[in-house]
């Protein structure tokens, strides 16, 4: 990384205490770049549009950063790398919070769609789990998940 930036290795470690911290910050940065806010904010007013956008961004991420969404890159922080794990959890929580916001403000969702057992938070968690599964399988076709949304929420 230092060579690519044209700086010394020592200068990189002025900003990061360890390689694990550097890798964690890099992974966080890539997730943020892939899922940066779209120019069209309407994406966040409609659950179907949001999911379609997320899957488009996942496909973009796969093309832009080949191999990023492999099991290795999703799970590399399991071995005693607390800062990296914390960063990944913060990034994922941000995505989950965004999904919850969309679900709670989507005017198309039936008034009785959510219950005490089937909350917007639980639906967001399921949608996020399906997204992670799709990432690992490199399947960027949201057709099935969009149909699930239509049948359960609209």
Residue ranges: model-predicted function:
Residues 71-72, 127-131, 149:
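Short alpha-helical scaffolding segments that buttress acidic/His motifs in well-ordered protein cores
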Residues 25, 39-64, 120-124:
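Hydrophobic alpha-helical connector segments
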Residues 1-21, 25:
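Helix-turn-helix
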Residues 38-42, 69-80, 134-138:
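Secondary-structure edge/capping motif, primarily at the C-terminal ends of alpha-helices
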Residues 80-81, 92-124, 153-154:
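Hydrophobic alpha-helical bundle segments that form small-molecule/ligand-binding pockets
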Residues 28-35:
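Short, basic, alpha-helical segments at the C-terminal edge of helix-turn-helix-like DNA-binding modules
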Residues 59-98:
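Short secondary-structure transition hinges
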Residues 11, 15, 57, 61, ...:
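Amphipathic alpha-helical interface segments
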């Amino acid at each position: 990384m230092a060579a690519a930036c044209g700086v010394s290795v020592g200068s990189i470690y002025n900003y990061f205490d360890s390689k694990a911290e550097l890798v964690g910050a890099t992974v966080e940065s890539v997730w943020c770049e892939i899922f940066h806010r779209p120019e069209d904010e309407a994406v966040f007013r409609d659950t179907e549009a949001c999911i379609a956008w997320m899957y488009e961004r996942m496909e973009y991420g796969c093309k832009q950063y080949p191999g990023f969404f492999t099991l290795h890159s999703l799970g590399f922080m399991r071995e005693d790398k607390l800062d990296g794990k914390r960063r990944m959890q913060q990034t994922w929580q941000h995505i989950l919070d965004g999904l919850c916001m969309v679900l709670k403000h989507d005017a198309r969702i039936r008034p009785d769609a959510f219950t005490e057992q089937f909350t917007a938070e639980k639906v967001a968690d399921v949608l996020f789990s399906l997204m992670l599964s799709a990432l690992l399988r490199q399947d960027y076709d949201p057709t099935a998940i969009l149909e699930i949304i239509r049948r359960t929420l609209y």
